[in-house]
Amino acid sequence: MQITDVRIRKISSEGKMKAIVSVTFDNEFVVHDIKVIEGQNGLFIAMPSRKTPTGEFKDIAHPIVMDSREKIQNEILSAYAKAIEEQDVEEE
């Protein structure tokens, strides 16, 4: 499965959540609401989730193979860095 599009839908400079992203696979399947989060060890992604009645968050969709997760994260963080760079250029 190939990542064919990454769309940074919302960018925030405040708080730990830095962006909300949609990723398209093979021009056929899209996953919305992936979050870019700033943690203690740098940026990472959080897959879309919902809150259970007990207050726990459960992923709605997520990769089950570590290599796939790393590939998705690398693509998203690369697109996020590019979007931030373009935003900085526009502000100058």
From Swiss-Prot:
InterPro entries: SpoVG, SpoVG_sf
SUPFAM superfamilies membership: SpoVG-like
GO biological process: division septum assembly; sporulation resulting in formation of a cellular spore
Pfam families with a match to the protein in the record: SpoVG
UniProt keyword Cell division, yes or no: yes
Keyword Transmembrane helix: no
Keywords: Cell cycle, Cell division, Septation
Function: Could be involved in septation.
Family from the record: Belongs to the SpoVG family.
PANTHER family in alphabetical order: SEPTATION PROTEIN SPOVG-RELATED
Protein name: Putative septation protein SpoVG
Organism, as annotated: Clostridium botulinum (strain Eklund 17B / Type B)
